[in-house]
């Protein structure tokens, strides 16, 4: 399997403060890698390194030539006095064709929002629009920084199902930052626990038993993870209702 991005022994220092130390990772097509860690662990800094927004102080980064990246930021700040529809917001992205906007919104089940004001969107609707915008350049790598921030629990479930669906359909790599331990871990292939350095990494069921993971999130967090992965035999619709994968039936 080819590698889209490779980080080799990356460190980042701001002044006298070391934010990241000796980070190595690879991002591959069709795989979801989730970054977990406490506030101040360096997760957003690592995302910016992957995006090429900041250069590492030491170490090397190799990107696939011509790599197309779609990015969903942690927060979007809009002037509430500026009238801006979803359609207009989508067209602010350089190189976007008007004909591409509706298909992108349909892909994330948000076509009905096309003419809605951005300022009137709910948290979940806002994230779907940002995700649609990130898909406009047919990304090989999708980078999601806290994609469910400000979204209610039902909306979080639906968004994670959507991200997994997009990964399957597009075959893209996904780098995701999250705090939603028991939800996101059921949807990821690999976990990297970060606290300036890599505390542990690997498949969720392996990481959940690692001493440093337990020290970071507690035994209860590890138990929640194990139970959730074992029983997660369903997906969720846009309202968070359960749809069993083997029957198509719904539950409350």
UniProtKB/Swiss-Prot annotation:
GO terms for molecular function: ABC-type zinc transporter activity; ATP binding; ATP hydrolysis activity. It catalyses: Zn(2+)(out) + ATP(in) + H2O(in) = Zn(2+)(in) + ADP(in) + phosphate(in) + H(+)(in). It is an enzyme of class 7 (translocase). Its main location: membrane. The keyword Nucleotide-binding applies. InterPro entries: AAA+_ATPase, ABC_transporter-like_ATP-bd, Metal_Ion_Import_ABC, P-loop_NTPase. Keywords: ATP-binding, Cell inner membrane, Cell membrane, Ion transport, Membrane, Nucleotide-binding, Translocase, Transport, Zinc, Zinc transport. ATP binds at residues 37-44. It is a peripheral membrane protein. The complex is composed of two ATP-binding proteins (ZnuC), two transmembrane proteins (ZnuB) and a solute-binding protein (ZnuA). Part of the ABC transporter complex ZnuABC involved in zinc import. Responsible for energy coupling to the transport system. Belongs to the ABC transporter superfamily. Zinc importer (TC 3.A.1.15.5) family. This is Zinc import ATP-binding protein ZnuC. The lineage of its organism: Bacteria, Pseudomonadati, Pseudomonadota, Gammaproteobacteria, Enterobacterales.
């Amino acid at each position: 399997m080819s590698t889209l991005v490779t980080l080799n022994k990356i460190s980042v220092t701001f002044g006298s403060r070391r934010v990241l130390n000796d980070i190595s990772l690879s991002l591959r097509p069709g795989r979801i890698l989730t970054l977990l860690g406490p506030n101040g662990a360096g997760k957003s800094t690592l995302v910016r390194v992957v995006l090429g927004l900041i250069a590492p102080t030491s170490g090397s980064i190799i990107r696939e030539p011509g790599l197309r990246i779609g990015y969903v930021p942690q927060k979007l700040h809009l002037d509430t006095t500026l009238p801006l529809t979803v359609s207009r917001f989508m067209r602010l992205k350089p190189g976007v064709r008007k004909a591409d906007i509706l298909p992108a919104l349909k892909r994330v089940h948000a076509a009905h929002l096309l003419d809605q004001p951005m300022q009137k969107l709910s948290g979940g609707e806002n994230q779907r629009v940002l995700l649609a915008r990130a898909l406009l350049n047919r990304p090989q790598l999708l980078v999601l920084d806290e994609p469910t921030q400000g979204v209610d629990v039902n909306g979080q479930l639906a968004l994670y199902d959507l991200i997994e669906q997009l990964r399957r359909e597009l075959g893209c790599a996904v780098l995701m930052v999250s705090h939603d331990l028991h939800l996101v871990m059921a949807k990821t292939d690999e976990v990297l626990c970060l606290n300036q350095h890599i505390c542990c990494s690997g498949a969720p069921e392996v990481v959940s038993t690692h001493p440093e993971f337990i020290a970071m999130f507690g035994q209860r967090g590890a138990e929640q993870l194990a139970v959730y992965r074992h029983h997660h035999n369903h997906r969720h619709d846009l309202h968070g209702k359960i749809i069993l994968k083997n029957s198509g039936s719904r539950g409350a």
